[in-house]
């Protein structure tokens, strides 16, 4: 089984990717039987959906950009979990995240291929209470349209997902409360994915 993480920041190697690395690391450390992969959208040519309908017939997009390289990874029948990590921009997800989610409509149109895939979301904000939970809910709404199974960060907090603060004076790696939520999110996605997909 495989769990894929998507880093939706336009900035390569920054706080969103660091947070996702921690989340995916918790999976690798605690569930060695699960394969993990991270797709970093930073620097990719990823355009928004143009609603042309081309993908209604097959898993192919009419736009010739980097999303076409992502399709084979996401259509893998071993996909058991999908974790989306996004920065908070003006109280919601990044434009890269929105473009990515809109383009995944092809998986819905071709037999709901994400049905029963376990979904988790994490958001990185510039303030401790900087819109992370609202952003997570926005991403989760797209996952629900795919008929995915959503989980939060589990015990002990059991909230919407991973919530990180990029404004910590000593760097995001010192955001201990936030790190606990992203590590717990990874653990929870893996735990539920194993129960469903074995």
Segments predicted by a language model, with ranges:
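N-terminal beta1-alpha1-beta2 submodule of the flavodoxin-like/Rossmannoid cofactor-binding fold
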Residues: 1-110, 156-198
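Short, glycine-/small-residue-rich phosphate/pyrophosphate-handling segment
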Residues: 95-96, 109-160
């Amino acid at each position: 089984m495989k769990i894929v993480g998507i880093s939706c920041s336009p900035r390569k190697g920054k706080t969103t990717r660091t947070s996702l690395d921690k989340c995916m690391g918790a999976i690798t450390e605690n569930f060695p039987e699960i394969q993990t992969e991270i797709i970093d959208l930073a620097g990719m040519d990823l355009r928004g959906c143009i609603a042309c309908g081309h993908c209604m017939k097959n898993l192919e997009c009419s736009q010739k950009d980097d999303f076409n390289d992502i399709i084979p990874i996401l259509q893998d029948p071993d996909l058991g979990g999908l974790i989306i990590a996004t920065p908070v921009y003006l109280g919601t997800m990044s434009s890269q995240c929105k473009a990515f989610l809109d383009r995944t409509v092809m998986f819905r149109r071709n037999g709901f291929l994400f049905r029963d895939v376990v979904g988790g979301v994490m958001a990185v904000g510039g303030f401790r209470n900087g819109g992370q939970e609202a952003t997570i809910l926005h991403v989760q709404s797209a996952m629900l349209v795919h008929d995915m199974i959503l989980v939060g960060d589990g015990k002990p907090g059991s909230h919407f997902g991973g919530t990180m603060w990029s404004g910590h004076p000593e760097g995001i790696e010192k955001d201990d409360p936030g790190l606990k939520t992203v590590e717990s999110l990874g653990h929870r996605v893996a735990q539920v994915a194993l129960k469903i997909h074995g």
